[in-house]
Amino acid sequence: MAFDFKKEYKEFYMPKRTPSIVTVPKMNFIAVRGSGDPNDEEGGYKQAIGLLYGIAFTIRMSKKSSHQIDGYFDYVVPPLEGFWWQDGVIGVDYTNKDSFQWISVIRLPDFVTKEDFDWAVTEAAAKKKQDFSKVEFLAYDEGLCVQCMHIGSYDDEPATVQLMHDFMEQKGYELDITDKRLHHEIYLSDARKTAPEKLRTVIRHPIKVKGR
């Protein structure tokens, strides 16, 4: 049976609908950076998702290629994730989507090296006749965070975020969003096929002990 990150690491991908504190270890990702409204059908976000999955599936199917990855095992491609920010805003202003800056990512299994990643970019570009130059290998050490499962529309996320922040403060922590530590979302539902009120999204914010 294929390894499923969501099931094997439930503390990171399947939190409860009540906030919790978690320490997230360093992970490697396929990443594409961009800006603008993610709902724009002609925008960079939709293109970025296509690039991410192009590399993700090239790596997953590498077992059938001449490039054999050391330590490879069958796995389910992890869910799409995103880091979001806006210049001059702490957190996220959902009413002004045009000002979004984002890094769209998909997690890589630990056995994938930078060399394996570079092979996948070259392989995907040759096979799909696409430009994959925007895709990068991102190592990210998220650390101490508060997180919660949000059920519902993306536009309703502020209510869940407020629950997270209230919980965080009760536990003696404070928000630690910086230019390196960002608002993080993990998308467990396909927005194209799921009613808005049923969308499942993990929301995660970086925190630190209050006063430190």
Predicted segments, located by residue:
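A solvent-exposed interaction/effector surface
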Residues: 1-212
